């Protein structure tokens, strides 16, 4: 199977209909409007990322004019064939010498089942997800390619000595969403000038993918020596698919396939990458420690909702107080090419504990027209939300732990943890809606209304949290102090020291 030629992309019509498996030419050369259709949101994100990376190497626009033209107009079949011709040999899943995202000649004592390629299907934490039984039993070529790419670039490594991708084990991936799959893919392909700016030393890098020019064992690799093709399709593990079985239904996408893969071989493999490779699909955090600049990609490290990270994914921040961040190159490109357009942002990834997946994350966040110029307003909205969360947590922490130096007993129950989860759940109905609808140039009234709603939410959650203990004689004084703590922090959150209901 060849990813540039054969049918492997699982889609359904944008307005509903049956699932179909189409090829890349059908996607690029037709006005049909498709959306991806897989049973797992992380596999859909991985499929989109794979399509974007393929698009980046075969069809980067030469300038903004061509970029806009391609968004509006499908390629002709001749144009498409010319674009893929130099790359066809690189994308055979079952190539005899250099199969896609694999290493030939892997030595392993046991065959690993395909479910191990699907993050979170097997292992101690799989109960955290809703997975169809047997989902990783036998995968078609398309789902296998998507899973290989996802495991290598967007999910934690296998653990136990296996490396993760160039962005770390659980990077946050951000994409601009268009009206359909074709436009979404093309919106996230950097133009040639921006690609050259992202990779200025490309002529001095190694740019063949790892399955054609393998990483050497124990090699020490400067990140700056990795070309954009090699980096986008980086494979840190030694994996080789076992021979496929015959015709049947794919256990992942549910479609009939002539060949299905049931297992693979893997072996440990060690190397070191020095420095950070400038991946165009992820925001980057910058810190200064002891005069040294450190960079790392944004990751989901807590269960806090995506809105808490918004200022890091759409607003560049120069280093202040030893911290800064850069948004993904694909988001910055859209900011510059469409300075008056609203933004639909796809944001996804995993939260993990070492090799175990704790949570799958996949959100679409909406930003009203003006987001490009009003990063300060976006920052304020996020800061307001986090401020009220912190006020609630501090007050309930006081109630839970008491005041040891004043001999006031605490409840001994982590009510602050439970209330924080409820705050986040409720805030997901408020803050994303504000960002999607606010007039950024006249945001003061909207932010004031948001403050009022979050103030009321904090009061409600505080009262709910302490209600079971309100009549306990030994906790009455602690409750009074905790409530006073809440209103103290709420008053501090009012602009210019405004009044509080407390």
Q: In which residue ranges do the predicted regions lie?
A:
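Extended alpha-helical scaffolding segments
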Residues: 1-123, 150-502
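Beta-strand elements of modular eukaryotic interaction domains
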Residues: 128-130
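Short Cys/His-rich metal-coordination motifs, predominantly Zn2+-binding knuckles/fingers
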Residues: 140-143, 253
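Acidic (Asp/Glu-rich), glycine- and aromatic
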Residues: 140, 149-150
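Flanking scaffold residues of small Cys/His-coordinated metal-binding clusters
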Residues: 132-135, 244-245
């Amino acid at each position: 199977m060849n990813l540039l030629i054969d049918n492997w992309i699982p889609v359904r019509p944008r307005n509903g209909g049956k699932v179909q498996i189409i090829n890349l030419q059908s996607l690029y050369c037709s006005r049909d409007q498709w959306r991806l259709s897989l049973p797992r949101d992380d596999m859909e994100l991985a499929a989109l990322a794979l399509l974007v990376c393929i698009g980046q190497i075969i069809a980067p626009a030469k300038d903004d004019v061509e970029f806009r033209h391609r968004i509006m107009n499908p390629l002709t079949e001749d144009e498409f064939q010319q674009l893929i011709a130099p790359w066809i040999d690189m994308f055979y899943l079952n190539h005899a010498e250099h199969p896609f995202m694999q290493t030939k000649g892997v030595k392993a004592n046991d065959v690993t089942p395909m479910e191990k390629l699907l993050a979170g299907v097997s292992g101690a934490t799989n109960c955290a997800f809703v997975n169809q039984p047997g989902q990783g039993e036998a995968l078609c070529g398309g789902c296998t390619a998507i899973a290989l790419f996802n495991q290598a670039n967007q999910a934690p490594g296998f653990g136990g000595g296996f490396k993760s991708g160039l962005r770390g084990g659980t990077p946050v991936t951000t994409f601009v969403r268009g009206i359909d799959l074709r436009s979404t893919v093309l919106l996230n392909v950097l133009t040639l000038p921006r690609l050259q700016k992202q990779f200025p030393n490309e002529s001095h890098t190694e740019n063949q993918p790892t399955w054609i020019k393998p990483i050497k064992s124990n090699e020490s690799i400067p990140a700056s020596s990795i070309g954009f093709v090699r980096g986008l399709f980086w494979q840190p593990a030694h994996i080789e698919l076992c021979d496929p079985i015959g015709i049947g239904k794919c256990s992942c996408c549910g479609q009939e396939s002539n060949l299905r893969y049931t297992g693979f071989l893997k072996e440990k493999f060690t190397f070191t990458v020095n420095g950070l490779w400038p991946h165009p699909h992820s925001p980057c955090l910058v810190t200064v420690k002891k005069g040294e600049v450190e960079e790392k990609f944004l990751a989901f490290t807590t269960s806090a909702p995506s809105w808490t990270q918004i200022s890091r994914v759409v607003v560049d921040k120069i280093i202040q107080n030893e911290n800064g961040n850069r948004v993904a190159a694909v988001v910055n490109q859209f900011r510059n090419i469409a300075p008056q357009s609203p933004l639909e942002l796809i944001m996804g990834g995993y939260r993990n504990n070492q090799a175990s997946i704790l949570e799958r994350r996949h959100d679409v966040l909406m930003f009203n027209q003006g987001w490009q110029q009003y990063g300060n307003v976006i920052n304020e909205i996020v800061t307001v939300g986090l401020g009220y969360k912190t006020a609630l947590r501090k007050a309930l922490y006081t109630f839970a732990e008491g005041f040891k130096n004043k001999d006031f007993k605490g409840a001994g129950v982590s009510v602050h943890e439970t209330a924080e989860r409820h705050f986040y759940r409720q805030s997901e109905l408020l803050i994303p809606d504000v960002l999607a609808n606010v007039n950024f140039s006249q945001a003061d009234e909207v932010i004031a209304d948001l403050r009022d709603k979050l103030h009321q939410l904090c009061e409600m959650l505080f009262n709910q949290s302490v209600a079971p203990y309100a009549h306990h004689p030994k906790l009455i004084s602690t409750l009074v102090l905790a409530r006073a703590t809440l209103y103290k922090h709420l008053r501090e959150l009012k602009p210019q020291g405004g009044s509080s209901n407390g």
